[in-house]
Structures are given as structure tokens and as C-alpha cells.
């Protein structure tokens, strides 16, 4: 058996920034640091930060006065921001800048009274934060997940509509929903480029190439990671068995029976150490070598807030 590695895979710039914000806050201010929701959707990352003194909460009422609070990479609603401002808290925002871009699109629509339709997954924290940027009762904010949702949707004014998307969706599925929106509402206005982020798009392209050459695909990522789930689904859609795994310990030998080539990739919130552990586990099971495929180069970096840059640490 041989191992093929998707390229790119693993951490994106937004995840890297979010984790760095928590790590630097811990270095500067010391534990405990409170984080609203899991900073990124990866069990290993969250457990590691928890061991260092991060406390993950869902309600700001759980945070004591005078504490440090960090918003997760998924973003928060205007109501959550207002609640945090009303408290004696020092707040750092780890929202991915590409999610913030979508927030600004929604806020702009809200100010204009333009009805807004978000393509996204119900219950996902990014969706909750994005929907929570709209507060104009004269307009409206709607969530759709599928073309069927679009055809059932009723709006106030079909001539005053715009749409935006969650950043971690399936590129193919989203294209189908956008086609339905344009067919149902011909006057609808969308972003110049859809809001699915570069990392999501690149990793889906990479897993498509990987699946073409692999007999089975292993996706390193947690079950609550939207982008990791999309990678597994995409590999299955092109006809290859695919398994979403949190760690090397999840691998079942039965998955590898009769396989010559094992494809390995990782979601945008999965650290490389987990991929290396998967490679080691596969070698113990008889795989030889690990070849990385040629892929799209990524060199995007998002800065942490200036208060957390190491060269300006002033708190003892």
C-alpha cells in the first residue's frame, strides 16, 4: 500500500490566526482565558488549549467580570457583541477575516433594507453569527440550505434581494443553490465572487484530485467541522469510500483491505501533527512511503490583534 497526501490540506490562515490569539492571550494574561464556543472545530486543538487554561463557554453569563473573552473563528452576532460590551470584559475577536467580510455584506444589506438570503447550514455557529448581523425589520433575513428551500421561500420584495454564503460549504452544492436563487429571483444580487473561502475551495479541489488516484480516502477532522465533512462527502460523491477521523486511533484495518493507494487529507481546522500520526499508523498497518500531490500554493497570513503581538507584550 502507498499513501498519497492531498495538497493543500490542514490549517488555513483563519484557523491559524484564531489559535494564535488564544495562545498569545494565555502567554500574556495567563489562565484562565474564556473562549465563546470552540475556537475552531477540532477536538485535539480544543483539548490542547483547555489543558493550557482556556475555558470554552457558550453563554457570556458564564464569564466572570474582569476576565479575558475571545470570540471563536466562526464569528458572533451583533447581540453577542453588545452583551460583551455591556460587561467588564477584555474582548479579543478571533473571527476569521473572511467571515467578517460576509458579516459586512449582511450589515450593509440591513442598513439599506435589502432582504438578504444566506446559503448555509442550520445551527452552525458561523450561520448564527452571520444571521445575527441583520436587524432591520423593514427588510428580512432568510436561511436556505438547498434548491428545494429556495423554491419554497417567500420574500417581501423579489426586486430588492441579495444573497451571501457560509464560508465552508460544498462548492458544487452551493452552485446548485445559487442557480436556483437566480432562477426563482432573477433580480437577486450576489457578491462579485461567492463567499466560500479560498481554503475551502482549495481543499475541495485537492480532495477531488486525491480521490481520483486513491482507493480509499481518510479525512482528518472532527465530526462538527463543516469543511471536513464536505471533504469526506466530496470523496464519496466521486465514488470512493471516505472516512472522517479525529485521530489515527479511529482507523479500522477493515477499511484498508484490498486497497493499493490510501489518500489522506485534513480539514482546515486539523493540525498537521494529526496527519503525521495517521501516516505513522498506516505504516504500522503495512503502508510504504507518503507522496504529496502537487497542489495550489497558499501564502495568506492574517495578523493577530496588535495587543497580542509578542513584541508589544507589557502585562507581567
From Swiss-Prot:
Pathway: Isoprenoid biosynthesis; dimethylallyl diphosphate biosynthesis; dimethylallyl diphosphate from (2E)-4-hydroxy-3-methylbutenyl diphosphate: step 1/1; Isoprenoid biosynthesis; isopentenyl diphosphate biosynthesis via DXP pathway; isopentenyl diphosphate from 1-deoxy-D-xylulose 5-phosphate: step 6/6
UniProt key word Flavoprotein: no
Binding residues annotated for (2E)-4-hydroxy-3-methylbut-2-enyl diphosphate, in chain numbering: 41, 74, 124, 167, 225-227, 269
Chemical reaction(s) catalysed: isopentenyl diphosphate + 2 oxidized [2Fe-2S]-[ferredoxin] + H2O = (2E)-4-hydroxy-3-methylbut-2-enyl diphosphate + 2 reduced [2Fe-2S]-[ferredoxin] + 2 H(+); dimethylallyl diphosphate + 2 oxidized [2Fe-2S]-[ferredoxin] + H2O = (2E)-4-hydroxy-3-methylbut-2-enyl diphosphate + 2 reduced [2Fe-2S]-[ferredoxin] + 2 H(+)
Alphabetic keyword roster: 4Fe-4S, Iron, Iron-sulfur, Isoprene biosynthesis, Metal-binding, Oxidoreductase
EC code(s) of this entry: 1.17.7.4
Annotated catalytic residues: 126
Residues binding dimethylallyl diphosphate: 41, 74, 124, 225-227, 269
Cofactor remark from the record: Binds 1 [4Fe-4S] cluster per subunit.
Superkingdom, taxonomy of origin: Bacteria
Class in the EC hierarchy, top level: oxidoreductase
UniProt-annotated binding residues for [4Fe-4S] cluster: 12, 96, 197
GO terms assigned for molecular function: 4 iron, 4 sulfur cluster binding; 4-hydroxy-3-methylbut-2-enyl diphosphate reductase activity; metal ion binding
Binding of isopentenyl diphosphate, residues: 41, 74, 124, 225-227, 269
GO biological process, one term: dimethylallyl diphosphate biosynthetic process
Cofactor entry: [4Fe-4S] cluster
InterPro entries to which the protein is assigned, alphabetical: LytB/IspH
Function: Catalyzes the conversion of 1-hydroxy-2-methyl-2-(E)-butenyl 4-diphosphate (HMBPP) into a mixture of isopentenyl diphosphate (IPP) and dimethylallyl diphosphate (DMAPP). Acts in the terminal step of the DOXP/MEP pathway for isoprenoid precursor biosynthesis.
Family: Belongs to the IspH family.
Subunit structure: Homodimer.
Name the record gives this protein: 4-hydroxy-3-methylbut-2-enyl diphosphate reductase
Organism: Sodalis glossinidius (strain morsitans)
Amino acid at each position: 500500500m502507498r499513501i498519497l497526501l492531498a495538497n493543500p490540506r490542514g490549517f488555513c490562515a483563519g484557523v491559524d490566526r484564531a489559535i494564535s490569539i488564544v495562545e498569545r492571550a494565555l502567554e500574556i494574561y495567563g489562565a484562565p482565558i474564556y473562549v465563546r464556543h470552540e475556537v475552531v472545530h477540532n477536538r485535539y486543538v480544543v483539548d490542547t488549549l483547555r489543558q493550557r487554561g482556556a475555558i470554552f463557554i457558550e453563554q457570556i453569563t458564564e464569564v466572570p467580570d474582569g476576565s479575558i473573552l475571545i470570540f471563536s473563528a466562526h464569528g458572533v452576532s451583533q447581540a453577542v457583541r453588545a452583551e460583551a460590551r455591556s460587561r467588564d470584559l477584555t474582548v479579543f475577536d478571533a473571527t476569521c477575516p473572511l467571515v467578517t467580510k460576509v458579516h459586512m455584506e449582511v450589515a450593509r444589506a440591513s442598513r439599506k433594507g435589502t432582504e438578504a438570503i444566506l446559503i448555509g447550514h442550520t445551527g452552525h455557529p458561523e450561520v448564527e453569527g452571520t444571521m445575527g448581523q441583520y436587524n432591520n425589520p423593514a427588510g428580512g433575513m432568510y436561511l436556505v440550505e438547498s434548491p428545494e428551500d429556495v423554491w419554497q421561500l417567500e420574500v417581501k420584495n423579489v426586486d430588492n434581494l441579495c444573497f451571501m454564503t457560509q464560508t465552508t460549504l460544498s462548492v458544487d452544492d452551493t452552485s446548485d443553490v445559487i442557480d436556483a436563487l437566480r432562477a426563482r429571483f432573477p433580480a437577486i444580487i450576489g457578491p462579485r465572487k461567492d463567499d466560500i473561502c479560498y481554503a475551502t475551495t482549495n481543499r475541495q479541489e485537492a480532495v477531488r484530485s486525491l480521490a481520483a488516484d486513491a482507493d480509499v480516502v481518510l479525512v482528518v477532522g472532527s465530526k462538527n467541522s463543516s469543511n471536513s465533512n464536505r471533504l469526506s462527502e466530496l470523496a464519496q460523491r466521486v465514488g470512493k469510500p471516505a472516512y472522517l477521523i479525529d485521530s489515527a486511533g479511529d482507523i479500522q484495518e477493515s477499511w484498508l483491505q484490498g486497497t493499493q493507494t490510501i489518500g489522506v487529507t485534513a480539514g482546515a481546522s486539523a493540525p498537521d501533527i494529526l496527519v503525521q500520526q495517521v501516516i505513522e499508523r498506516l505504516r504500522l498497518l503495512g503502508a510504504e512511503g507518503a507522496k504529496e500531490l502537487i497542489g495550489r500554493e497558499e501564502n495568506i497570513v492574517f495578523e493577530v490583534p496588535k495587543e497580542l503581538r509578542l513584541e508589544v507584550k507589557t502585562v507581567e
